[in-house]
A protein has these predicted regions:
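Catalytic cores of DNA base-excision repair glycosylases
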Residues: 2-200, 206-215, 219-220, 283, ...
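Intrinsically disordered, low-complexity, charged terminal extensions of DNA damage-control enzymes
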Residues: 1-22, 28, 191-354
Length: 354
């Protein structure tokens, strides 16, 4: 097994040095702030999408101190469209923590990095190896996939036993003299060669030793123990207009889209037609007797990791203001300066003159 581990590491580094042409703006970066920022952006986000956001953030906030001092609404607006907004909340909290408690310098110790909000083992390993060249192996979906296929491991990657097994194997395989180069190589290899779908097995440097390829299990591995069950939710947004202004509020509860802005929301237990919805008590309680429905959108759908959101937008004009409500009245020209969830910005894009 020791020889197999040594050969794997050596061959992977050879591949990276000889054939790896993947370029990214943060690749080869030694600044822990920029590494951290790129890793937070890339959590649950494709590199192609994350790249432009990374460049925007670096341009606006070249240091962690600049990010820490920025207005939260401004940061959320810049994050708009990336989704998984808990990452943005963690980004803000950690930037302030580093600026205020670490004199603007990221800690070098792996255990200290793990204490930062939003930093898990993968991100801590990335910062440790790329910024400080410390021997900590990154373990993400790419690594799970490569190791499961190459070594023919059927243990579910999301099981307790599987996590221990894969983390140990990843650490054993890590080239301790070149942890930064090795970690970058295995991530690039997973993204370009050992892909989830349509992997390039015929030209892969490991196809003579890969057990999944040898046993025709490439499309089976890695194995997952749990299957994701998505919750279905139905949102009816009331785009209520009074005196050429719209009623909006910031979502503060612990739910999706926390800290983002929205119109008046009615969540229904099941989907009903809009004509039926505007006759319900739920609708009547949110508006007043002067409410006049101007128009409404078709139903939109958005897939989140654990939820499917389906909903619509109902444009309503009022002759008198709403009383005793927690909403702010904002001019339509000011809406573009606020961060809304993608579900709502899709409506803006399709209805620019609503």
């Amino acid at each position: 097994m020791k020889n197999k581990i040594s050969d794997f590491s050596k061959n992977l580094l050879f591949w990276s040095k000889t054939y790896n042409t993947r370029t990214m703006p943060w690749k080869g970066e030694k600044d822990p702030y920029k590494i951290w920022l790129s890793e937070i952006i890339l959590q649950q986000t494709r590199v192609e999408q994350g790249m432009s956001y990374y460049l925007k953030f670096i341009n606006a906030y070249p240091t962690v101190d600049k990010l820490a001092k920025a207005k939260e609404d401004e940061i959320f607006k810049m994050w708009e469209g990336l989704g998984y907004y808990s990452r943005c909340r963690n980004l803000i909290a950690t930037a302030k923590n580093i600026s205020e408690n670490y004199a603007g310098l990221f800690p070098k110790e792996y255990d200290h990095l793990l204490k930062l909000k939003g930093v898990g083992p993968y991100t801590a390993a990335a910062i440790s190896s790329f910024a400080y060249d410390l021997p900590f192996a990154v373990v993400d979906g790419n690594v799970f996939r490569i190791l499961a296929r190459h070594f023919g491991i059927n243990t579910p990657i999301d099981s307790f036993v599987g996590k221990i097994l894969f983390n140990k194997l990843a650490q054993d395989l890590l080239n301790k003299k070149q942890p930064s180069a090795y970690n970058q190589a295995i991530m690039d290899f997973g993204a370009t060669i050992c892909k989830p779908k349509l992997p390039l097995c015929d030209t892969c440097i490991f196809n003579k030793t890969c057990l999944a390829f040898k046993n025709n299990k490439v499309n089976i591995l890695p194995v997952k123990e749990t299957k994701l069950v998505k919750k279905q939710r139905y949102f009816y947004y009331l785009v209520v207009k009074f005196d050429n202004k719209f009623y909006i509020r910031k979502r503060t509860e612990k739910d999706i889209w926390q800290n983002l802005w929205e119109f008046i929301l009615v969540e229904m237990p099941e989907k009903i037609e809009i004509e039926q919805f505007i006759k319900t008590k739920s609708f009547a309680q949110k508006v007043n007797k002067t409410a006049a429905v101007k128009n409404y959108s078709p139903f939109y759908k958005q897939q989140l990791t654990h939820q499917t959101i389906e909903g619509c937008f109902i444009l309503i004009n009022l002759q008198s203001p709403l009383l005793n409500n927690d909403f702010e009245l904002v001019k339509s020209s000011n809406l573009k300066n606020l961060a809304f969830p993608r579900f709502i910005t899709s409506y803006f894009e399709k209805n620019p003159t609503f």
